[in-house]
A protein has these predicted regions:
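Extracellular receptor-binding modules and their adjoining Ser/Thr/Gly/Asp/Asn-rich linkers
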Residues: 1-45, 76-102
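Terminal beta-strand-rich extracellular "head" domains
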Residues: 45-71
């Protein structure tokens, strides 16, 4: 089966937003470089798989970013983008896909 949810997030804007998405109802801007993807339909448990990729934005970071995340929930996924110095960083593009039972 394909991804149950996927998002392409513009994270370098003043307020992050979905460039495009599937299976996500909204994006919540928590704080600097911390967002929450809210799912249209809940996963059956919080053991779903996610994959991500990102491109560094205007805030720098040497073009290298990693994702940090909180404990996954069935109805949302909260994440933050970090540079190699382990500091939160805005990114030009954050792409996340989620796989699991709904």
């Amino acid at each position: 089966t394909g991804a149950r949810v996927w998002v392409n997030v513009e994270g370098d804007a003043g307020t992050p937003y979905f460039r495009d998405s599937y299976g996500a109802s909204s994006l919540t801007d928590i704080s600097y470089a911390v967002q929450q993807v809210n799912f249209s339909t809940n996963f059956s448990n919080s053991n779903y798989c996610f994959v991500s990729g990102a491109r560094a934005g205007s805030s720098g970071g040497g073009g290298r970013v990693v994702i940090g995340y909180d404990q996954p929930a069935t109805s949302y996924f909260k994440y933050q983008m970090r540079n190699l110095g382990n500091n939160n960083e805005h990114v030009d593009a954050a792409c996340l896909s989620f796989f699991g039972d709904m």
